[in-house]
């Protein structure tokens, strides 16, 4: 079984860069989810506390109001309104291909670019890459970095990290919840993070549009008893007026994978007019390596969580079913 990378060399490099930097921009992906918010705020707060650089936290969308009670007094600056050439370091945290790509196209030539992510399919190039799909959340990677530096971080940083971890593990219900995650979360609670307040806030923050999207996907799910596969589809019509977050799609697959008799779940969605993306999820008891399925379709990932992208369209979504052409 594959093991997570330790990133000792990369952490040394990151620490050196942070100590040398003067102006740092940390970027959360568009339509930021809890892991994007948590990782951006945690790293920004950590640098402010322990390094000398000026910090700006950026995102093409505003800081989510739903998280302002547990992560107060934070503002995201729109990168379009910043002079990006003033930054000597820019860092993308989580789903870096959803916004960070636009930033690094407009920085100065000598700017150092850093990508920190736990998504397996990141192709974006940067000067420093701290990316491993075996981590449950980008906040988990940052926790390891903070521990690596031997700096004693506070309640605010611990809270931001736990927000991301709880968000991407589905409050410890998804298959990516490991013993390491639970030990890490216990440490964050010791540092002052309130697990009950975070879970209550995240549970209450699901938008009606998101719940409706999940409902449509769950309503057209098909179960293939012969192999234990649950399959569903999300169309362009489903997504009209809804800025899709890939995490929302993954959450549908994760929920389906927990249903009794389901060994693995696949949710496909129309990413654009001619591209279909798929999210594969499994639980350990299913004994299915979904990365093998993803690899046959040109994708990747790991045993319990993988994804792929293929050309095509989802058509005929009605009572008679749907198909990909």
Predicted regions and their residues:
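Hydrophobic/aromatic beta-strand patches that form the interior of the parallel beta-sheet core
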Residues: 56-58, 91, 112-116, 128-131, ...
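Short alpha-helices
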Residues: 116-184
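An acidic intrinsically disordered interaction segment
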Residues: 1-13, 106-111, 133-142
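Hydrophobic helix-and-loop "lid/oligomerization" segment in the mid-to-C-terminal part
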Residues: 2-31, 36-68, 83-87, 167-296, ...
């Amino acid at each position: 079984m594959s093991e997570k990378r330790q990133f000792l060399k990369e952490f040394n490099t990151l620490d050196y860069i942070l100590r040398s930097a003067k102006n740092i921009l940390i970027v959360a992906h568009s339509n930021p989810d809890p892991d994007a918010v948590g990782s951006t705020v945690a790293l920004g707060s950590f640098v402010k506390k322990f390094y000398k650089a000026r910090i700006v936290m950026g995102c093409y969308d505003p800081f989510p109001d739903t998280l302002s009670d547990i992560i107060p007094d934070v503002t995201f600056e729109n990168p379009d309104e910043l002079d990006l050439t003033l930054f000597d370091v820019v860092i993308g945290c989580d789903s870096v291909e959803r916004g960070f790509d636009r930033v690094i196209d407009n920085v100065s030539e000598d700017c150092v670019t850093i990508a920190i992510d736990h998504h397996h399919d990141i192709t974006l190039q940067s000067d420093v890459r701290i990316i491993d799909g075996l981590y449950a959340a980008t906040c988990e990677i940052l926790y390891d970095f903070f521990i690596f530096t031997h700096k004693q971080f506070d309640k605010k940083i611990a809270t931001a990290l736990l927000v991301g971890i709880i968000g991407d593990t589905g409050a410890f219900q998804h298959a990516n919840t490991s013993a390491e995650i639970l030990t890490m979360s216990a440490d964050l609670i010791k540092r002052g993070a309130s697990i009950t307040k975070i879970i209550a806030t995240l549970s209450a923050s699901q938008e009606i549009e998101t719940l409706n999207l999940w409902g449509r996907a769950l309503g057209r799910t098909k179960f293939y008893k012969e192999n234990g596969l649950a399959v569903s589809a999300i169309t362009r019509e489903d997504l009209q007026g809804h800025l899709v977050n890939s995490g929302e799609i993954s959450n549908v697959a994760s929920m389906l994978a927990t249903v009794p008799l389901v060994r693995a779940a696949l949710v496909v969605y129309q990413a654009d007019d001619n591209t279909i993306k798929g999210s594969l999820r499994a639980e350990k008891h299913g004994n299915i390596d979904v990365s093998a399925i993803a690899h046959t379709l040109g994708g990747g990932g790991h045993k319990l969580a993988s994804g792929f992208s293929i050309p095509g369209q989802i058509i005929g979504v009605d009572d008679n079913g749907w198909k990909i052409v």
